[in-house]
Amino acid sequence: MQFTDTIYALSSGSPPAGVALIRVSGPATADALARLCGPLPPARVATLRTIRTRNSDILDSGLVLYFPGPASFTGEDCCELQVHGGRAVVSAILDELAAMDGLRHAEAGEFARRAFQNGKLDLVEVEGLADLIAAETEMQRRLAVEQSGGGQSALYAGWARRLTHARAMIEAELDFADEDDIPGSVSAAIWTDIGRLREEIDEHIARAGVAEIIRDGLKIVIAGEPNAGKSSLLNALAQRDIAIVTEIAGTTRDVLSVDLSLAGFSVKLFDTAGLRETDEVVEREGIRRARQVIADADLVLLLSEKPSDFRLDEWQPGKSVPVIRVATKVDRPMPRWKTSEADVFLSTRTGEGMDKLLAMLQAHLPDLAGNTALSMPSRRRHVDCLRQAGAALVRSMEARELELQAEQLRQAGDALGRITGRVDVEKLLDVIFSEFCIGK
């Protein structure tokens, strides 16, 4: 796709900084670069140049790279200016670009959008790039690299090729059934592979829960009766003061949360109001919110300072959530606990039991040991399209007429195509590219 306008933006972080990167892309890139720096540098070679205004006043000096299209990030002529990252320097260069005819400031995600529309990236790679920029943990980085690097897209493309081959065999039987060189009932040979493909898609969908934990974090809720040590545990796990800790029961009235990194995974830790019956309006609202986050939890740490206080069933009706029973304040002489009465015996004051608790938390994280690639659907729209593809494959295997079989295989292929953006995704584009910052 050819664009008539040329866009520019600061692609690095906000100044001041040691270095700032300004990106330009579009048909007027070469002219804009020549007006700033003189003769064009060799393609894809970092060259030190003096950057000047239209009146030849010096703005700065820095490295300049020129990428003639289509061998560039966006697929069109593109350049990057690596200059000093002071506010005045960056502002002056952007003002100089703004004064040039045919140039305008880029919108959020517009460089990536041009890369997509010029066939340099597909939608899965674009989403992976957005996730890579936002990644805060090692597992988020690994998942994003798998997608932005094309590994996930290659999997879907392979499935699409198998569907295309199956359709070709069926349609060959439809169109050339009377020809001697077309074997009879050739379509029967492809159904074993179609069944295997459906199983592969189902297995892939089953891993979506792992991807959700990687992207959004494992939700761990600290629950228990008032004054059981919930806020102290939150502070100990966060290694800083998040919650107010007092000996007064009912100090925590609202749900507090903190994001942690545990064994490379993102963990969202919630501290909740003490669970008890009360007539106090504010505390009752806090308990209602506590029940709500317990219902959404992946794991509950149920705390008690007395063996008789481990009661969660009455606070989470209708849902079973994994629970770790944590005996707290065990540095005190009373009460005496039996080893069977709790899973972890903990004192946030002395640190006793913290290592065991952390080990138990890690045991609830997905086991990805030995997996160098993380091939799994990371977004709800991926899962929806995969389910549509799987359902179409089931219908194709149940159909008796060749025309219906071929049509269902076409629908399955279209569903896979919507994941990568090759089919009917125009309405999605604004949402996806809005996740990017300006300059990417």
Swiss-Prot record:
Entry keyword set: Cytoplasm, GTP-binding, Hydrolase, Magnesium, Metal-binding, Nucleotide-binding, Potassium, tRNA processing
GO MF term list: GTP binding; GTPase activity; metal ion binding
Top-level taxon in the UniProt lineage: Bacteria
SUPFAM superfamilies cross-referenced by the UniProt entry: P-loop containing nucleoside triphosphate hydrolases, TrmE connector domain
Binding positions (Mg(2+)): S231, T252
UniProt-listed Enzyme Commission number(s): 3.6.-.-
Binding annotation for (6S)-5-formyl-5,6,7,8-tetrahydrofolate: R23, E80, K120, K440
Free-text remark on how the cofactor is bound: Binds 1 potassium ion per subunit.
Alphabetical list of InterPro entries matching this protein: G_TrmE, GTP-bd, GTP-bd_TrmE_N, GTPase_MnmE, MnmE_dom2, MnmE_helical, P-loop_NTPase, Small_GTP-bd
Cofactor(s) needed: K(+)
Subunit structure: Homodimer. Heterotetramer of two MnmE and two MnmG subunits.
NCBIfam families noted in UniProt: PRK05291.1-3, small_GTP
Record-stated family: Belongs to the TRAFAC class TrmE-Era-EngA-EngB-Septin-like GTPase superfamily. TrmE GTPase family.
Protein name: tRNA modification GTPase MnmE
Gene from which this protein is expressed: mnmE
